[in-house]
Structures are given as structure tokens and as C-alpha cells.
From Swiss-Prot:
This is Cindoxin reductase. The gene is cinB. Keywords: Electron transport, FAD, Flavoprotein, NADP, Oxidoreductase, Transport. Its cofactor is FAD. The keyword DNA repair does not apply. PANTHER family: GLUTAMATE SYNTHASE 1 [NADH], CHLOROPLASTIC-LIKE. Its EC number is 1.18.1.-. One of its GO terms (molecular function) is oxidoreductase activity, acting on iron-sulfur proteins as donors, NAD or NADP as acceptor.
Length: 451
């Protein structure tokens, strides 16, 4: 596929709608804005706040990664790029309405449902994705109240699993500079098991994640089997060496938490026993050896998929013209990020994905497959409800959160949508009427684009 083309003087620019303000959506907007600096680009987000995975999926103590949002702040400062939050596509407006209003529509809403393990079920079995959203004070998880107990078992050995291990094992005083609500770690387990089907050398986590665990100075770690380092693959060598370094004997007079890694074991069942539960594991290779773990709770970290109530079904928009290899769903309709390729790869992969999909969009406009003629947000404004949030509204929310730095936190997130909306609209009790707010939307967009 060709490289991104340079903008031609006099070229008519398309109006563009992007669904989802996470990394996939923002990188898509960033790339298309570079191609067409004056094109109207509108990013729609279900929540009143932007940045999706960066805000609610990245671990609260990984603020360096979350700082990527600052480059997206600069994107939204551009006159032709707009954020419209608190709009759920599929509920408040349809994809078809977006297609009627915009020349190009890109679906980049991600996939957030935890992949279930059919063999494990019960009221003490939690998905790691939901747990991470809870740690990040996601408004969808306000009623979520996990009871991890004194002993918890994490199924999975990818980076998300290691994030959960670290957040549960770190001392509560070690979260200075994070945006983790202190109330969420008032009760931490003293025993953590980590179970993975593959051997240590094939585990999905990065060695850096293990080195972070080694920084917890009042924890002890053990592992049942680790391949000796020396593998010709440098990543595998680094991974096994990090594990051996982690589990090497070290003086911890009074360990606060004990973490055990079990590689090469597959969970088979979870049965209630007395006050707790017994997790039955079978050896992945032999299928003969059995291991039993007494646990109070289980957290599954085995990947993601579709299934959350608000998610858009990609299959519904596939057509005979679809070419998912480069993000095409139908004429003028595209998809990017996890929504396109499935739940694989992190933020850097989403950046590459966005560039690839944008190349196809640019080629379609250049070839005449898409003829720019639609007015974008101006056509759609009458369909929007009065509680949408623009980027200025998000900046108000951001300022309030950043001002709340109790307990050494870098911010304290507003936990519910109603409170977010109050601060976004700078209101207390009065509500703007539908017609007045729709006029505000079109006036604001017009003023911004004339700057």
C-alpha cells in the first residue's frame, strides 16, 4: 500500500466522523488531520471524557504511558478537530446517521469485554478488564464491588495479568504520583497465585513487568518451574532471567504478601469448599498431573472480545466491498484498532493500524471512490441531545480532577457521569434547553474553524 499522500492545494477535503476517542481513534484523527489540515474531524465518545484505554485501561501507576494523552490534547486544540462526548453511537445516534452527515466514518470503539473461561464461574470470579476499569474509577464500574479475600488467583500471564498482580501486591503507600483512588486498595490480599497454561519461556508478559514486581520490597515471590536463561531469543532470555532474579532468595523479615507463579497449568474447575474455593489445575502438557489451590477469588486475564452492552457489532456493517485487511467496511465506512483486527497489540500497534487505515481512506478520496460533499456536524446537530460535552467541557473536568491531589495522587477522577456533566457544563441546577444547546454546538464549531 502506498505511503500517505501530501495534501494538494485546492483539493476538496472530506468531512470525517470517528467513533471512539481512545488511541485508535485519536491516532486516526491525527493522521487524517496531517493529510487534510482543514477537514472537519469530529470524534464521538460514549463517555463525557476522552482517551478510552489511556484513561481507563492503562494501569493507574503507569502515568508515563497515560501522558500520551497530552499529544491528543494538542490535536483537539486544532481548529478543525472536535470532541463530542457523552454520545453513544448506536443509542443516541446511529452509524447510518453519521454516514448521512459525513463523507468518511471510522469505527474505532475498541473491544472491552473480558473473554470468559467456561470452566470457571461464580460470584468470586472477576475479569481482569473489569478489575482494571475499577482500579481506574471508570463510571461503568461504580457498582462493582469485588471481594478478593485473603487469597486470590490470577489466571493468565500477559501484561494485563501482571498489572493486576502489581496493583494488588504493592504497598498502599507506594502509589504516590498515580491516579489510583486510595479507597480501592484498603483491603489487599496477602496471598496471590498466578497461573499460566504455557511454560515461562512462552509467557506473554514483558520482562519489564517482572522487574517492576521486583521493586516491591516487602513481598516474596516463588515459581514452580522456570527455563534456564540462555535462549538465543533475547526477549525469552530476558523474560526467564527476570523471573529468576525475582524469585532469588532475598531477605524479607516480615513479608506482607506472598506471590507464587505456576507455569504450565490449565484451570479445570472451581468448587466451593467451606469458606473459600478450590481451584483444580491440570498439567497442560501431560493432562495427568493435578494441582489444587485454595483461594477466595479468581481473576481471569485471558484476553478480550465483544459483548459489552454498548458495543457496536462490526459484523453488521460488513459488506461485499469489505476489505478488513486495510479497514474498509463499505464505501466511506472504515474501522481501526481492536475494532478492526481484534484484541491484539497495544498502543504502538494501534498507531500503526491507524496509519494503515488512513492510507486506504486517502486513496479512496484520491481515486474518487469518495466524493467530499457532506456538511458533517452542521447536518447532525439537530440529532444530538443537550448533554453532549465538547473539548472545553473536558478541560473543565480535567482541571477539577488535577486539582484534587490528596494522598499524593496526580489526580482524583470524577467517578460518575452526572458529576462530570455538572463540571463540564459549569452548572449547578440549571439545564440548557435542547434548541439552545444545539445552536451552541454549531456556533462553537463555526467559531473554532474560523480562527
Amino acid at each position: 500500500m502506498s505511503k500517505l499522500q501530501h495534501h494538494s492545494i485546492g483539493e476538496v477535503e472530506p468531512s470525517i466522523a470517528i467513533v471512539g476517542s481512545g488511541p485508535a481513534g485519536c491516532y486516526t484523527a491525527q493522521t487524517l488531520h496531517k493529510q487534510w489540515p482543514s477537514a472537519q474531524i469530529v470524534i464521538f465518545e460514549r463517555l463525557p471524557v476522552p482517551y478510552g484505554l489511556l484513561r481507563y485501561g492503562v494501569s493507574p501507576d503507569h502515568q508515563g504511558t497515560k501522558a500520551i494523552a497530552r499529544q491528543f490534547d494538542r490535536l483537539f486544540a486544532e481548529a478543525s478537530v472536535h470532541f463530542i462526548g457523552n454520545v453513544e453511537v448506536g443509542k443516541h445516534i446511529s452509524v447510518e446517521e453519521l454516514q448521512d452527515a459525513f463523507d468518511v466514518v471510522v469505527l474505532a470503539a475498541g473491544l472491552g469485554a473480558d473473554r470468559p473461561l467456561p470452566s470457571l464461574a461464580g460470584d468470586a470470579v472477576y475479569g481482569a478488564g473489569q478489575v482494571m476499569r475499577w482500579f481506574n474509577s471508570h463510571p461503568d464500574e461504580q457498582s462493582f464491588a469485588p471481594g478478593f479475600g485473603a487469597t486470590t488467583t490470577i489466571i493468565g500471564n500477559g501484561n494485563v495479568a501482571m498489572d493486576v498482580v502489581r496493583l494488588l501486591a504493592k504497598h498502599r503507600d507506594s502509589f504516590t504520583g498515580s491516579d489510583l483512588d486510595p479507597q480501592l486498595i484498603e483491603k489487599q490480599p496477602s496471598r496471590i497465585h498466578v497461573v499460566g497454561r504455557s511454560p515461562a519461556s512462552a509467557a506473554k508478559f514483558d520482562s519489564m513487568m517482572i522487574r517492576e514486581l521486583a521493586e516491591i520490597d516487602d513481598a516474596v515471590f516463588d515459581v514452580d518451574v522456570v527455563d534456564e536463561p540462555g535462549h538465543e531469543d533475547k526477549r525469552i532470555h530476558a523474560k526467564t532471567k527476570a523471573l529468576l532474579d525475582l524469585t532469588a532468595a532475598r531477605a524479607v523479615p516480615s513479608p506482607r504478601v506472598h506471590v507464587s507463579f505456576h507455569f504450565g497449568w490449565t484451570p479445570e474447575s472451581l468448587e466451593p469448599t467451606g469458606d473459600g474455593r478450590t481451584l483444580r489445575l491440570v498439567n497442560t502438557e501431560s493432562r495427568l498431573a493435578v494441582k489444587l489451590i485454595e483461594t477466595d477469588s479468581v481473576i481471569t486475564a485471558v484476553g478480550f472480545g465483544s459483548g459489552l452492552r454498548h458495543e457496536i457489532d462490526r459484523v453488521r456493517f460488513e459488506s461485499a466491498a469489505s476489505d478488513l485487511d486495510n479497514g474498509l467496511l463499505d464505501t466511506g465506512l472504515y474501522c481501526s484498532g481492536w475494532f478492526r483486527r481484534g484484541p491484539t497489540g497495544g498502543i504502538p500497534a494501534n498507531r500503526l493500524d491507524a496509519k494503515m487505515v488512513c492510507t486506504r481512506i486517502i486513496e479512496d478520496v484520491a481515486s474518487g471512490a469518495i466524493t467530499p460533499k457532506k456538511r458533517g456536524l452542521e447536518e447532525l446537530a439537530t440529532h444530538l441531545h443537550p448533554d453532549t460535552v465538547d473539548f472545553t467541557g473536558w478541560q473543565r473536568i480535567d482541571a477539577v480532577e488535577a486539582s484534587r491531589t490528596e494522598h499524593g495522587r496526580c489526580r482524583t477522577k470524577l467517578p460518575d457521569i452526572a458529576t462530570m456533566l455538572d463540571f463540564a457544563r459549569n452548572r449547578t441546577h440549571e439545564r440548557t434547553t435542547d434548541d439552545t444547546y444545539r445552536k451552541q454546538i454549531t456556533d462553537t464549531v463555526g467559531h473554532k474553524e474560523k480562527r
